[in-house]
């Protein structure tokens, strides 16, 4: 696990005010609330390779509203990059945490995602009094009150921003990993279980960036260890793809 990036633009003269917000008893902030809300989302739970990225974003209420925000999955790569630049420029605070494939295999993808969410919120907790998290679970041990919001990446602007920051960060890293392992074409599929990726697993077996606890990777590895000419049957890999963790 590592915190890839963190930025805070809050000024220290507001320390007392921020502390009073942080310890507010209001359970869920509304439009009238003075709480600064961190939106939290992840990218990369489902892929067979690479890290899971989790971002937290707190908007600066004194900066212009960012138009065009949406769930990162609904945006083109070019549009995500454009919005990413605006988000990190106008956010009061933001953070991104990467949990690598080794840690994912050690504690499982669910726990890795929860860990990433907790660390991402900790990265903005000096300004955020509340966290709103995409999904149906709130991680334990957060430094501030929080709620889970199913479908939040299509409903809440701060979560939309977090989804974009997480996605852009992870995609950039997968391009870097492609340079190290070009045979897998991580730049094309970003580690997801596409036919291209499954074919590369058959031919080359897994690399250190692959998640060995995921069924298609495990099947490919077992095939190589058994010395088979072909690493598993293509139909078996397709079936394994369907049961890989989401």
From Swiss-Prot:
GO biological process: DNA replication, removal of RNA primer; mismatch repair
Cell membrane listed as a keyword: no
One Pfam family hit: RNase_HII
Domain spans labelled RNase H type-2: 35-226
UniProt entry tagged with the keyword rRNA-binding: no
GO molecular function: manganese ion binding; RNA binding; RNA-DNA hybrid ribonuclease activity
Reaction catalysed by this enzyme: Endonucleolytic cleavage to 5'-phosphomonoester
CDD domains, per the entry: RNase_HII_bacteria_HII_like (cd07182)
Gene Ontology cellular component annotations, sorted alphabetically: cytoplasm; ribonuclease H2 complex
Disulfide partners: none
NCBIfam families according to UniProt: PRK00015.1-3 (NF000595)
Full protein name: Ribonuclease HII
Organism: Xanthomonas oryzae pv. oryzae (strain MAFF 311018)
């Amino acid at each position: 696990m590592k915190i890839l990036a963190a930025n805070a633009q809050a000024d220290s003269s507001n320390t007392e005010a921020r502390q009073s917000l942080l310890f507010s008893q209001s359970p869920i902030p509304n439009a009238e609330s003075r709480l600064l809300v961190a939106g939290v989302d992840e990218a990369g739970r489902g892929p067979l390779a690479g890290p899971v990225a989790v971002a937290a974003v707190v908007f600066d209420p004194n900066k212009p509203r960012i138009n065009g925000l949406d769930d990162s999955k609904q945006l083109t790569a070019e549009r995500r990059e454009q919005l990413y630049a605006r988000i990190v420029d106008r956010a009061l605070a933001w953070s991104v945490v990467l949990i690598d494939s080794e840690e994912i295999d050690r504690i499982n993808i669910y726990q890795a995602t929860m860990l990433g969410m907790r660390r991402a919120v900790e990265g903005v907790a000096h300004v955020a009094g509340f966290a709103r998290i995409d999904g149906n679970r709130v991680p334990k041990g957060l430094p501030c009150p929080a709620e889970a919001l199913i479908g939040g990446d299509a409903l809440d602007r701060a979560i939309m921003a977090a989804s974009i920051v997480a996605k852009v960060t992870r995609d950039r890293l997968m391009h870097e990993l492609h340079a190290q392992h070009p045979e897998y074409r991580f730049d094309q599929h970003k580690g997801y279980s596409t036919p291209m990726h499954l074919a590369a697993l058959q031919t080359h077996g897994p690399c250190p960036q692959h998640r060995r606890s995921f069924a298609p990777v495990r099947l490919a590895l077992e095939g190589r260890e058994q010395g088979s000419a072909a690493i598993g049957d293509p139909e078996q890999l397709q079936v394994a793809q369907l049961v890989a963790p989401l």
